[in-house]
């Protein structure tokens, strides 16, 4: 009799609308219970039985119950699941398979089966890609997943690489395809094969995309010609190879190997500016005054060049510093190195005064064995030869930015607008507490930003610099010319790495249109989004593989007294993150390792400090000695403690 009773339905509706609810994100703990985080201030307890319906990271709506003044959340509706596509390790065999997601806070095995069309017979320990098919909040009895791709077996030495690439859905190998002959682009190429062009790279580099040639003019000024590899001479816009490069957007550099944007035949051979091989190039000629200013008379042109020497950073640096035994092959090459060194010094000086120069940080290189084992991690400081190439490339990219802006009004630009205007007042207030006075309006201009950066660089430590980093906006890729505050330049458009960056290939095509005096369409906006997304994924992949290799490398140091110098890079409520100076590994120091009495300890992310009994004991940028307490291989995390 109550079946279709409208009064009962109304009562139910009323009760439903009067019951308090909250939307938020589920945070799991290792103890079975969890929390519904509504915002930074408010969270609700989720009891263990209710946690069985949800997963860490799910965005849900929950009913809020109050019992004996204690609030708890009962998950009711799924807004957005945390897991859709994921990688994990298979458990069980035959018909009873499950998969444990490869995530530090997801420990439970999810029942699964191989999806239709997947041929592999999965067994214990296999790595796989899975997709969620069922969720308790969608009316299903339990969680369930399909295995959509086999990655590799448990003991594969190269698990870090294959699993990471599968996780981010990135390619594992070079694209297929060959370029049979050069295109007829209607370009006249200047024959520069007689000139002493040189390339300077790491000794192991195969994809050389820049060659340099310098000469001194009669009036004492220096003329620099930057010749860049010319893949668009082989790859037509809209072709199969072009579309593959557009999707990849960048060569993906991972520890130990790279996955190129172009077929290796092009990237490492046909386009690579190899010594004593004639190659097509796109070139830029500029004149540099004694104070480092680049003349307005910038020339872009198509050329044919022949590099006369493949030089290595360390050899060139040693020779300029009068160290080591290496010598240039002949006086012509020696003269090139000397002239390029002069250009580097004057451009560096100009950028110090008129733009901004980054602080030098070492690059960390993993030395790997045949089986992917980490033999060593080497810190490679940026030396004078690295700076020669860097200054030449920045100058060339500045020239391209100007020419594209003035001739076309568009291009692929790297744009960075400094501080977010919404943060300007908070930034000025923070700086004031440290004795630096800035105008909140002025600091949003390129000039004001540069002025502040120079003041910060003059500080005795990088502490204040680290405090204001959170107020900065992110660099973007844009088709519209705009300033690059980080470099302190009015505009910046890269074209010097077309073998490894699709945006540089686009700029090549635009520059060629300028050279020929032809009209050309503005690049589509969606390409900048694809490039930004790929850059993000490639960086995450590099970090993930690095974390895995660092954990392998430091595993045997866990629990020993081996000391490492470490720079504090972040403070949070739970402790501090540090970077080991010698190898670049990131480790976490939990708060209890800093001081045993929790009430006497204040870890402030806001201030970047750790206080014990009111005294600041640690702050961001401090370098301290640590030992490795534990390496958790399953989550690739390194736990350190201050050395006694």
Swiss-Prot record:
Cell compartment(s), UniProt: Cytoplasm
Biological processes annotated in GO: mRNA catabolic process
Record keywords, A-Z: Cytoplasm, Exonuclease, Hydrolase, Nuclease, RNA-binding
Sequence ranges assigned to domain S1 motif in this UniProt record: 561-643
Keyword ATP-binding carried by entry: no
Role noted for this protein: Involved in mRNA degradation. Hydrolyzes single-stranded polyribonucleotides processively in the 3' to 5' direction.
RNB domain span: 189-516
Top-level taxonomic group: Bacteria
UniProt cross-references to HAMAP family, sorted A to Z: RNase_II (MF_01036)
Recorded name of the encoding gene: rnb
Name the record gives this protein: Exoribonuclease 2
